[in-house]
Every structure is written in C-alpha cells, then in structure tokens.
Amino acid sequence: MSHIMNLLVISFVLAGSSWSLLGYQDDFSSKRSGALASNPTYNLPQDKGYGRDMYQPYYICEPDNDGSALTLPSWHYSCKESCMGNHLKRVVNITGARWNYVGISIPVFKIVTNEVCYTSHENVWGYCSQYQISRPVATQKSDVSCITSSMWDNDKSPIGSLYNIVNSNEAECDYFSDITDCNRDYQIFKREGKLIKRSDDSPLELSIVTDGIRTDPASEYLSLDDVSWFWKLPNNDMSPPCGWEKTQKLSCSYTDTTDVIKCNSIGYTYNIQGISKKSTCAGNIYDTDGPFPFFYDAEEALMSTDDACGKAKQGKPDADIAFIEGVNRAFEDLELTYCSATCDLFARQGTPNEDHVLDTPIGTWRYVMRDNLDPALVPCLPTSNWTISDPTTICHGKDHILVVDTATGHSGSWDTKKDYIITGEVCNTNNDEMGDDYDGMRDKILRGETIEIKFWTGDIIRMAPPYDNPEWIKGSVLFRQNPGWFSSVELNKDMIHTRDNITDLLTVMVQNATAEVMYKRLDPKTMKHILFAEIVDGVGNVSGKISGFLTGLFGGFTKAVIIVASLAICYIVLSVLWKVRLVASIFNSAKKKRVRISDILDEEPHRIQQSRPTLSRKKKTRESIQMLLNDI
C-alpha cells in the first residue's frame, strides 16, 4: 500500500511540474512573481547589500557625556508629550551645515620600528651560520633623526612614498663563542596631514585621515602603541581655509513641553538642552560637533489638530460637523494610544550595554549607562555615508577599524560590534582601549596566531596564517538588520559593504601589517637543511684551508700537487671498492653452495661421503677471504 501511495505522490508532483512547463498557473502565480520582483530581501543570495548581510555602520551618534544625552525619565516624558495633539507645536526651519576635510596641507611621517637581532654560530667545521629575531618596538622621539632633509621636500619625496632604513647587519663570527648584534630598522610612510579649525573658539587640529589621527599640531610628535608620527609646522600663517558649507533646508517640529526638536526628513532628533551656537568662518552654526550641524533660519506656529478641525467645520451642516469631530477624536485617540504605548515600551526595555540603535516615536536613539550609573538615551543620525576606508587599518581597542565619511572626507573609528559610530572618535581618542588591538594584531602575526574580528550582525571573520584565505563564521544574534534604516537614508549598491568586499579589505589590512612586522624575516630551515648546509659548507671551508696551506707550502706548483694528490686518493678509493666487491661476490657464491645439517642427516651414506669434498672447499674459501681481508 505504501508503494502505491509513493507512486501516486510522485505522479502528482510530475503532473504539477508538467502543468507548470506547459504554462498552466494558479490564481496567485502573478502575485508571487510580483512580490519576488519588488521585495529586495529576496535577492539576498545574489545581492547581499539589502538586509542582514551588510557590514558597515548604520548610524552616527553623539558621545555619552557631551550634554546631548537625555536621562531615561526625561526622554520618556518628552516622548509621551510629543504624542499629545493638543500641545503647542512649532515648525523650526533650519539649513544643514557640512564641515569638509579642508585645511593647510603638511607632510607627516609615520614610522614603524623593528628591532632586528642577528646571532652568529661557528661549528667545528668552521662554518658560520646566522640566526635572526625580529620584533616591533616603540618608536622614540629621538628616532626622528632617521628622516632625512630630502624626505621633507615634497618635490623629491611625494605623498605616499615608502622608505626602508636598514641598520641591522649579520653578526661577526667567532670560533669560540656566539655573537649577537641588534639594531633598529625603520619603515617610514609619508602621509598628508591637514591643519583644520572647526569654529573660532576651537583649537587648531592636525588631521591625518589615512591613519584616523586627530591631534594637537604643536607637539610635532605623536606616539600610539609602537608607531609614531612626526611633522613640522609651517613658519608662515596657519589660518586654514573655511571648510563649512550649506546643504539642504529642513523643516523640523518642536513641542513646547518637550526637550526635543524632531526632524523627520533625516530621522534625527536634537536635545535642545545640549545644542549650542558657535561662531565659525561661515557664520553662527548650532551643534558644530554633532552628527548634523545646522544654521537656524526661522520658526513658525504649527496648526494644531483642534485648529485644523475648526477650519474644516466652517460652512458645514451640523451632521457633517458631528462626523468630522467624531473622526478627529477617533484618530487622535488611536494615535495617542499607539504613540504612548510605544514610548512606554522603549522606556522599559533598555539595557546598559545596548549595541544597537532603536527607532522610537521621537527618532533614533541608543541606550547608555553614564558615569553616575544613571541610564540615558543619546540621539543618533541614520547614515549611509560612513564606509570602511580603503585601505583600512585597526584603530584603538578590539574590533575597531578605520572608516571614512564619503561626503566630507573625514575619518573615524568604528567598533564593528556596534551598528553605529560616535562623533569625534578617531583612532587616537579612546585611551581606555589603546594598545589592545593593533599592537595585539602585530604580536599575533609574529606568533602565527589566528586573528578574529566580530561584527554587530554576530558574524566573525577569522584569518589564520598566512592570512590570505579568511573564513566567515555565521553568528546568531537577535538584531541582524534594521528595516527602519532603509527608509531613512539614500542608498545604492556602490555605498554598501558586502561580505566579499569586507573580506578583500581586511585581507589587505592584515597582509600590510604582516609586511611591516616580517619585512626582513629569514626563511625557517629544518634540522636536515641546517646539517646539510653545515656539512657541505664545512667541507668546503676545510678544503679551502687545505688549499691555502698547500699554496703557502708549494707556491706555484700548488695545482700540480693537488692534481697528483687527487689522483692518488681516487686510486686508493677505487682499489678499496674493487676488493670489497670481490669479497662480496665470494660470500654470495659460498652462500649458494652451503649445505644444511638437517639435509645431510636425511641423506643416504653415499651422499654423505660425496659431500666431504664440499666441506673442504668451504674451508679453503674461508682462508681465501681471510687473506683478502688482510690485504685490505
């Protein structure tokens, strides 16, 4: 019976397939094809940019303690008040401001220092071998002397130049002791630095966008982990050009009982308690250090729902007025209930270590636990402009890599375990995490260990020596995508990082670090190779000494003496080999004629008598062998 059922099922499947091939479709075929064509998430296997397989920061957020954060009770109150339709609301018109990467260009030198030690060992043959140990060491301020005057000249040394200064050499050889000689070798990379100034009262800064560095230019020196940067300030005027420019105009809303200004068109909300006006080269700009600085234009009253309802009732009969009022109250109650309930939900679900930004009724925010252990929320701006720098590098702290703003050219640091970056955070700003990452990666490369980088999607990229074939490990986390982000940003496929793109970028990053660490490392040799080299080179060394001795003894007849001696040695060796071969052949013939005792006892008496001459011949054979051995 079961076989019959299986045949029926197979027949049904085949029949359905044939109907599809013949063009027969059900009533929902067109709807299925339409959904597949319009929904980009169905294209994940081929186009991984839409959805859970994007590897880049989704948001840029304010720092935890810069005044932009709202305490959880304040945020909850502002969220609930924004839901009320009877409060006074105003429209705030602003113009966005963008601070571009513009400044005075100066040359900057990044120096990577390696201590290279050679140890010599001379064996009994007189053969000298060299063993090398190379390790990264901190670059000192005195190492600036390795930068020559021609390197500072941009005409002779363009930006992007690489110099290898090698001071290490093989150690001298000594027959009675091993000698170790250590020296410092330098790799010097020429970068472009720019002197920039954000506002009139802000200090002058030096930005090295290639390395994600922003620092005080007056020191002319910066050390981070075991790498250092050197530069010289120009003697002339250091007033940088203006980097501010105006962008799009926005209309934002403000409720008089709240702490927030909400700009729905960009998905960002300002905390009015934390924004301030600063004078710049382009005029007065608000929130100059925030994700979206702006020029204030004007504001006007926003018509309330009650005013809109009153306007709609003008000239209407009583029946229509009652209907309008009823519909208005229903929508107000529905919106208030939904909005307030969502505010309550977000206020109760926060955790201090939240690594993901949340979409709320009043914009996108992230949870933080401030120094006073008071939970708060920080505003965040959805963005698709921040992408991984090419080439990239490891910044401070574990899983921090260099990113760049494609709109302005500024660089920053991204903790890949989070779906956001923080304004103003670059590769040398987080002192708590310094020394745990790039230095650790270099040490891991020296030890031949595996390097792992974890992303906020839960996925991990694992790179094992020789670091040219990364492996992806699929993660399992609750938040792997944020659908609301796609509706808040302008996005195209050229702006996204897929898994293949990340693989290429990080592989190049690790290989560049490997080249810095192991640029002069000797190839390892097995014991077999070492012994072979010592024997061959040792014999050659002994031969050379013998040749020198004979040259001193016989003068111009040295070659003739060496030829005669070589012929004599060859004659002796061939004579010995011939006699050994003769002995071996005698042994083999004797072995073939050997008679076993058990065979002799089983033979008839006449066979025993016939075998006696054979035994006597064996005796003579042994005597002959002994004579040959004596001759040898």
From Swiss-Prot:
Would you indicate the residue range of the signal peptide?
1-17
Membrane topology per the record? Single-pass type I membrane protein
Q: Which residues are glycosylated?
A: N93, N385, N501, N512, N541
Enumerate the UniProt keywords alphabetically.
Glycoprotein, Host-virus interaction, Membrane, Signal, Transmembrane, Transmembrane helix, Viral attachment to host cell, Viral envelope protein, Virion, Virus entry into host cell
Q: Main localization of the protein?
A: virion
Instruction: State the compartments where it is located.
Output: Virion membrane
Entry protein name: Spike glycoprotein
The gene is G
